[in-house]
From Swiss-Prot:
Summary of subunit composition and partner proteins: Part of the 50S ribosomal subunit. Forms a bridge to the 30S subunit in the 70S ribosome.
Function as written in the Swiss-Prot or TrEMBL entry: One of the primary rRNA binding proteins. Required for association of the 30S and 50S subunits to form the 70S ribosome, for tRNA binding and peptide bond formation. It has been suggested to have peptidyltransferase activity; this is somewhat controversial. Makes several contacts with the 16S rRNA in the 70S ribosome.
Origin organism lineage: Bacteria, Pseudomonadati, Pseudomonadota, Gammaproteobacteria, Pasteurellales
UniProt similarity note: Belongs to the universal ribosomal protein uL2 family.
Chain residue ranges for the region called Disordered: 30-50, 221-273
Recorded superkingdom: Bacteria
Disulphide bridges: none
Annotated protein name in UniProt: Large ribosomal subunit protein uL2
Length: 273
């Protein structure tokens, strides 16, 4: 994998930094594992904007990813690594011994030709998925389940990982990248290693149009709007003279947004700011 800085042949290329991975498949994706993905423009069924700054962008197909890793005790060979427009991580197409193909998140260090396996008796090896009761304390894992059988929900983006720091009774304690420490049932499945493509954070798009290709529209500051459009709008100069709020008047910048008291007991330590 290489980090390439483009030559300044135009204003739009001047600051571009690309991530080039020669291992990625250059052809089309595996058609049986594709699904349609329709654009909403951030609108709901009434046509009202429910998510701002979304619209346009290139057409995409959704890749059906196996987050559950529930094909147990059947070895699979990695056929190829692929780009996925729906996520920052790359994906791997694997062929199981019984002939079935699936997409999985591509961990760091996994290459075409490698063998992976899921199940309680799988060896501790990058790309293998096991219940966390069978994974040694101190191991680095990704694609971690919060509920047994539901599929991985934690540490799925490029370069993400979680460390198992303790095992006590039916629970393991995880340290997340944010600094949060939380308990998860030891029966939950996790995949060994960290998610690949960690250089994703180093890329520079270089121009506004590159964000538009991705379906991301401009974000306008409230203080640049009129009073009718935003609580920060209007006035002389740039100072809006009040506590910062959202366009709907809800306090922001530091306001707590978590409301799930039911799972508070599983959080051993809050994330660091």
């Amino acid at each position: 994998m290489a980090i390439v800085k483009c030559k300044p042949t135009s204003a739009g290329r001047r600051h571009v930094v690309k991530i080039v991975n020669p291992e990625l498949h250059k052809g089309k994706p595996y058609a049986p594992l594709l699904d349609t993905k329709s654009k909403t423009g951030g609108r709901n069924n009434f046509g009202r904007i429910t998510t701002r700054h979304i619209g346009g962008g290139h057409k995409q197909h959704y890749r059906l990813i196996d987050f559950k890793r529930n094909k147990l005790d059947i070895p699979a060979v990695v056929e190829r690594l692929e780009y996925d427009p729906n996520r920052s991580a790359n994906i791997a197409l694997v062929l199981y011994k019984d002939g079935e193909r699936r997409y999985i998140l591509a961990p760091k260090g996994l290459s075409a030709g490698d063998t992976i396996q899921s199940g309680a008796n799988a060896p501790i090896k990058v790309g293998n998925a096991l219940p966390m009761r069978n994974i040694p304390v101190g191991s680095t894992v990704h694609n971690v389940e919060l509920k047994p059988g539901k599929g991985g929900q934690i540490a799925r983006s490029a370069g993400a990982y979680v460390q198992i720091i303790a095992r006590e009774g039916n629970y393991v304690t995880l340290r997340l990248r944010s600094g949060e420490m939380r308990k998860v049932l030891a029966e939950c499945t996790a995949t060994i290693g960290e998610v690949g493509n960690s250089e994703h954070m180093l890329r520079v798009l270089g121009k506004a149009g590159a964000n538009r290709w991705r379906g991301i529209r401009p974000t306008v500051r409230g203080t640049a709007m009129n009073p009718v459009d935003h609580p920060h709008g209007g006035g002389e100069g740039r100072n809006f003279g009040k506590h910062p709020v959202t366009p709907w008047g809800v306090q922001t910048k530091g306001k707590k947004t978590r409301h799930n008291k039911r799972t508070d007991k599983f959080i051993v330590r809050r994330r660091g700011k």
